[in-house]
Structure formats: C-alpha cells, structure tokens
Amino acid sequence: PLFRSEIPDEAVKLPIKIKRLKVKKFCLAFFLSVTSVTSWAGDQVWCAYDPAGTQGDITRRLNDIRLYAQQYQVKFKVVSYQKEQQAIQAFDEGKCSGLAASNFNTYQYNHFMGSTSGIGLIPNNRTARNLLQLLNHPTIEKRLINKDYEAVGMIPVGTANMVMKTKKISKVAQLRGQRIGVLANNPPQQALVRSVGAQPVYVDLSNAIAQFQQNKIDIMPAPVYGLLPYNLQKDFGPDTQVINFPLAYFGVNIIIKPQAYPANFGRKIRAWFVQNSQLLTNRAIQWENHLPAYYWVDVSFYEKQSYDIMVAKIRNQYVRSGYYDAYFVELMKRLRCIDDPRYFECPMSR
C-alpha cells in the first residue's frame, strides 16, 4: 500500500474502581445504543444514477457495497434512476441518505471529489486507480468530510473523449467553429471550448447523445461506457470517430449524509474502494477496450502536448479562483508524473 491509514484514538478512560450498578447502567446504555443504530441504519436508501437502470454495472457495484456494509450492521437499499437529476433531487429532498451520481454533478457536496471531473486532471484509469488507493490516507480523508456530507468513494467509468461524425478533424486548430457539447454548470468546460474558437452548446448527461444524433452538436465528449449500447456508424453516421485524447475523467461519486450512519462508516466504505481499486478500474478498461479499434483516432505527440499546455492554463485559472481543489490538482500532477514522466508539468520533462 502507498500509505498506511491512521486511526484516531477514541478510547475512553474509565476509573479502575466502579460500582456494579454503574457497570449495569453502562452495559444497558451500550446495548440500547447498538440496537438503536442497527434499526435506524436499516431504513437507509441510496439513490443512484445508472443510465442502464437496475441491471447496470453501477447498480451492481453499489449492491456489492450494500452486502459489504451488512457486516458492520448497516443496511440500505439501492434505488436506481436513469435520469441523474431525479437521483440528485431525491437526495436533496431527504428521500435518501446516500447518493451515487457523476463527479461532474456532485461538486456541490464535496469539493475534492468533485474535482475528479476536472479538465485534464485524471488522464487514464491507472491514475484513477492510484487515487482510489489513497482514499483513506489521513491527509485526503479529512478533505472528504464536511458538516453535512461525506464522500466515501468513486466508481471509475473512464475517460471522456471527443466523439465526432467527421474524419476531417485531427488537430486542435480544426475545432474552430465546431459546436461542442458542454455541461451548463461547468465553467471550465465552457472556457476550454471557447479557447479553441469553438461554440459551447449546453447539454446534460441525459440528452447529450440525442443532441448529437439530431445534429444539434458536432462534437460530443463522452466516456466509452455511454457509447456501448450504440452502433456508432449506424446510429451516428458512417464517419463517426473517437479521438484518443482524454478531456476529463468520468466517475460516479458516492456521497452520504454521515449523521445517518454509525461513526467511521465512511472510512469502512472507503476501505472497500481501496481494496477493490484494481477490480473497479479493470472494469472501466474493459469497457474502453470493447470499442472496436477502427473507431479510435490517435493524435500526434506534438498535438497532445500543445493541447495539454492549453488545458493546464485554463485549469490553473480555475484553481486560483477556487473552483478546483488546489490540493487535489497537485496530487493529480504527482500521480500523473508517476505514470507519464513525459507530461510537460513533470520535472523529468523539463
């Protein structure tokens, strides 16, 4: 393991001599507290965004967590929504104490894990795996907990790449004038699109593919997972291609309301993500490998580096403004340099 988790000392010192009556009262209070925790945890609900519904991979992973949680006397059920906003609304309205939703739309609950969706921050599944392995490190753990919400993990989905219906674009300069789908609540995406002379068009996760099919946008950033139900040539056009260059990383963040759960429950769930980090990212890699090779288009190292520099410039503006978590950005730089020392922000590349 990269780090060893630190467990706070919560031992309570009791007097050596204690009356038998006090012991009985203590035991009774302890018993009542345990039984009350068990019963109240049994009513918990996790609202989950899964485009594939109850049979989707995201729901399956959440049910794995549900079974894992039972060994800690915590029971919850998973309610899946195919429209993300419905899951978020149910969570905000108090209908559920857990939420599984995209890292793009969980920013409001946790700044650190919300930054996992940042442009140019997580370049591949290996870096995502390394992040998961660090979730219970004390320096990171304290950034995952605030008064009302706690981030307990992320299900990796994969990198978001540009999907387009033409084979005429292979350079950044050729993006000028193109209509590119962006999320309305994501200013860095909008700034990035404008920086290349393209036109940002607002979409959300539920209508982006429909907008692309109806030619309301020319370029759709998307993870391969979202494309798997489609035949790209038949459903989008004969010249459809996917640029093998990640714009951002797509993951499903798990957010809970910690007051609804026993102490240290969040840490136990993060431990599950640490233990299963390789399995989770392998699944994301399998999805990406499932897309036939002839759809992928590589760009030159020079083009990648030019684009990386442009992305970093915009990203750093949003670090200074406080939109992205500064510690998270520095952590991602270090993890990225371990994986790709040639990246221009790494010491070895200078």
Name these PLM-found stretches.
Residues 1-2:
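Short, small-residue-biased leader/transition segments that mark boundaries at the very start
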Residues 42-72, 150-214:
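Bilobed "Venus flytrap"/periplasmic-binding protein-like clamshell domains
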Residues 43-160, 234, 239-248:
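Short, glycine-/small- and polar/acidic-enriched structural segments
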Residues 91-101, 179, 199, 214-223:
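Alpha-to-beta junction loops
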Residues 102-195, 246-349:
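Contiguous mixed-secondary-structure segments that line small-molecule binding/active-site clefts
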